Regions:
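Intrinsically disordered, low-complexity Ser/Thr-enriched
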Residues: 254-265
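Hydrophobic residues within alpha-helices
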Residues: 82-83, 126, 174
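N-terminal charged helix/coil linker that caps or initiates catalytic domains
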Residues: 1-70
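Glycine-rich adenosine-cofactor-binding loop
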Residues: 61-98
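Glycine-rich phosphate-binding loop and adjoining beta1-alpha1-beta2 segment
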Residues: 37-38, 96-134
Length: 274
């Protein structure tokens, strides 16, 4: 066993490695914090930050998540919550794509927006936020608009994409690019009290069934608005779908769409055509 691995094993306590020993190992053996976390998981040692995951997510599962690459398209109402939850879950690489900067009207619902970062690029704020949560997670910030022309390069290497967009045309382009790359994507949308989530695989036609008019830029959210709580709920369900896919769970929202009515407190499933 390499010396670094022996050191990590010796520093663990009841199968857990606390952050202090991450930093010591990184400095002692000239490793990145990402490399230390990966070595610990390879040894079957759970970083202590994930201790409360253990009853649900095993060390092997945690390793799967850490080896995964997720692309989040959009870093607004949905995207901020999705990035936060994926980082805390231990996804090893997260690409975040968004061209915008934070503005005052984002403050009601976008988790990363504060009075102090008005005018700052959303993806750069996301990178700083993730680094403050877990420096072992690699976040790739891309301040650019997603489209059909650049989509394949922006999603390169991703295992799954997550829709956190606010316009229909780009959502349809994302669906097309994911089909070309043969990767699934988790679809989520919010409007007022209402939300919808589904997981689409290459060949699924839900997007084009829902949005037959590909020239329409915005959906009903423009009329109903977006309060603080609806993106938080929908984003959490999207993050769950991502983790279930990466862990090989079969109970995905494929072939069905989850609709959420927070006003009536009702959740329904709608069967969709593949």
């Amino acid at each position: 066993m390499p010396e670094a691995d022996l050191f990590i094993a010796e520093c663990s306590d009841n199968g857990l490695l606390d952050w202090h020993w991450h930093m010591v190992a990184a400095e002692k053996f000239q490793l990145t914090l990402t490399q230390v976390e990966r070595r610990a998981l390879d040894l079957g040692i759970m970083p202590k930050r994930y201790q409360r995951n253990q009853a649900t997510i095993t060390v092997d599962d945690q390793l799967k998540l850490f080896k995964s690459h997720v692309a989040v398209i959009g870093c607004g109402g949905l995207g901020c919550y999705i990035v936060e939850e994926l980082a805390r879950a231990g996804i090893g690489t997260i690409t975040v794509i968004d061209p915008d900067v934070f503005e005052e009207h984002n403050l009601n619902r976008q988790l990363f927006s504060t009075m102090a970062n008005m005018g700052s690029a959303k993806v750069e704020v996301a990178a700083s936020r993730v680094d403050s949560i877990n420096p072992a997670v690699r976040l790739i910030p891309i301040q650019d608009s997603f489209n059909r022309a650049n989509g394949s390069s922006l999603l390169h290497g991703a295992d799954i994409a997550v829709d956190a967009l606010d316009n229909i045309a780009t959502r349809l382009e994302l669906s097309t690019v994911c089909k070309e790359l043969a990767i699934p994507f988790v679809f989520g949308t919010v409007a007022g009290w209402y939300g919808q989530v589904s997981t689409l695989f290459p060949g699924d036609t839900l997007m084009h069934t829902m949005y037959p008019d590909s020239t329409k830029e915005h959906g009903i959210e423009q009329q109903l608005g977006t309060p603080a709580f609806t993106p938080a709920v929908v984003a959490s369900i999207e993050a769950v779908e991502v983790c279930k896919f990466l862990l090989g769970k079969k109970q995905l929202l494929q072939g069905r769409s989850l609709t959420i009515d927070l006003l009536a407190m009702e959740v329904d499933q709608i069967e969709t055509t593949a």
